Amino acid sequence: MRIVLLGAPGAGKGTQAQFLMAKFGIPQISTGDMLRAAIKAGSELGNKAKAVMDAGQLVSDDLIIGLVKERVAQEDCKAGFLLDGFPRTIPQADAMKESGIVVDHVLEFDVPDEVIVERMAGRRVHSGSGRVYHLVYNPPKVEGKDDVSGDDLSIRPDDEEATVRKRLAIYHEQTKPLVDFYQAEAKSGSCSYLTIDGTQAVEKVNQLLSAQLA
């Protein structure tokens, strides 16, 4: 069960990733976690990555692919794995394919931009406790105030509307082309491709994924 998740930030991939990991007993592979682990372990690729990062440069696709290949060969990936946030670009997807990393299912979580903006820009947090509210879905009893302490609520920088829209623009420019890439792969029989309406209730999406991936 080798899965790639696609979808804009705020489309609900993280929630479903947790569900899929628990259901199928597969690990989630994050390139950031992999880089940190490889550097800590002092592996050859880790040392190369550290040198690049220490010089303030971006880690190359070749290095990342090497790390992914190393990671998916580990024991806990025997039953499969879940890739979220990678590949991000067509060259990365091509390089993955060329290096023999097989993908069984590509799941695209489709949510309109305006819904994502509402979801994320509507969040308010109480910095002292970490309590999270939402102007639409879970509003505080008193506008702008924490229910328990009465302190002012704030907006996380990542949830500012301008930031959300900027991240969405980057997603559409860089990652959206992967939809075409993997749909073409599915047509050729290399993998299955499933588009999921991410505006549905979490439980409904859980059921849909269980049925489709059974």
UniProtKB/Swiss-Prot annotation:
Example GO molecular function: ATP binding
Region (LID) location: 122-159
UniProt-listed PANTHER family: NUCLEOTIDE KINASE
Domain free text: Consists of three domains, a large central CORE domain and two small peripheral domains, NMPbind and LID, which undergo movements during catalysis. The LID domain closes over the site of phosphoryl transfer upon ATP binding. Assembling and dissambling the active center during each catalytic cycle provides an effective means to prevent ATP hydrolysis.
Gene Ontology annotations of biological process type: AMP salvage
Protein name (record): Adenylate kinase
SUPFAM superfamilies listed in its UniProt record: P-loop containing nucleoside triphosphate hydrolases (SSF52540)
Record-level GO cellular component terms: cytoplasm
InterPro entries on file: Adenyl_kin_sub, Adenylat/UMP-CMP_kin, Adenylat_kinase_CS, Adenylate_kinase_lid-dom, P-loop_NTPase
Taxon lineage: Bacteria, Pseudomonadati, Pseudomonadota, Gammaproteobacteria, Alteromonadales
Pfam families: ADK (PF00406), ADK_lid (PF05191)
EC number(s) stated in the UniProt entry for this protein: 2.7.4.3
Residues engaged in binding ATP: 10-15, 123, 132-133, 200
Record field: catalytic activity: AMP + ATP = 2 ADP
Purpose: Catalyzes the reversible transfer of the terminal phosphate group between ATP and AMP. Plays an important role in cellular energy homeostasis and in adenine nucleotide metabolism.
Gene: adk
Functional pathway: Purine metabolism; AMP biosynthesis via salvage pathway; AMP from ADP: step 1/1
Record family assignment: Belongs to the adenylate kinase family.
Disulphide bonds in the chain: none
